[in-house]
Amino acid sequence: MSQKNYILAFDTANEIIAVGVGKLERETATIKVLASCETPAFRASNTKLIAKIDAALEDAGVAKSELACVACGRGPGSFTGVRICTATAKGIALGLDLPLFGVSTLDAQAWDQWAKGARGEVVVLGDAMRI
């Protein structure tokens, strides 16, 4: 049996739907991004997320049966956005019998800055959307 080598990751905690498909590089413990998209979706994640996931998988040339795991953003962020993300991820993971991992949205943003070369302290700020 061949080893599954792809990860599906997405987040809807904020006003953007972020979706990515990556190849697990087991030898180097890294992930090579094959397809990704960020789409504005102010209060519309529930109507756009599945289509964006399907499009990312198609762009990457990866079938759902080739996925090794699912990762989803777990906030902080919009309460409804986090619930949409978590419920979708749980449904996909259960339906495909895959492990599911929750990732802090703040950690993901900080690690993105590290990958872009930032060193030292990194502070992630987010709009609390309160007036």
Tell where the protein language model's regions lie, with residue ranges.
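Nucleotide and nucleotide-moiety/phosphate-recognizing core
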Residues: 2-8, 17-131
